[in-house]
Amino acid sequence: LETYKVKSTKVKEIIIFGDGNHPIWKEANSLTNFSSPWNDQLVKKIEFKAIHNSEKIYFQFKVDDNQTFTYPSEDKNDSINNSDRVELFFRSDDSLNPYYCLEIDTSGRIMDFKAKPNKEFDFNWNWPSQEIEVKSTVHKNYFIVEIAISIQSLKDLKLLKNGLIETGIYRAKYNQQKDNSFLPTWITWVNPKTETPNFHISNSFGVLKLK
């Protein structure tokens, strides 16, 4: 499996603002090898970083984009599901039974759900709200999403084992078409080698290795 090494920091109190300016991000490894295996167009730069202390793991997406799209809908999940977003999926093993999904739009709204194989989704499940925090900022040519998740919640869900978290890292980019509709380009860290875009399979996951 593809591996990303999550460095540790001695900084104890870390407040995320979603602006990318906290000094801890300079300590983290940078992951930029994202692609859309189903699309010939060049993918604009996506930079993913993660770092942890004894209490929490912190994730950051910095995404080059000068035209972010948010789908207008009264229903939050319907809106996020059709908008520019970043995604983290976590599994305890490759059976995907279950796995947990966080899909976050450019304004920092979360669509979180528990899933089982064959896209069986439970939207009544939520990541415990006191164990996760999300902040974001949108700029002229890029947006940033930062996520803080408690180590304890990852252990409770059996997702952090022996310093490893099996993780999928994704992005949905919505592009305006000639008829003014918006269609997604599906972007992933690990190429699942499927004919059509599908992140909800075991081949789309890699490993975060906590140091």
Which stretches of residues belong to each language-model region?
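Structural preference for beta-rich elements and adjacent junctions enriched in aromatics
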Residues: 1-211
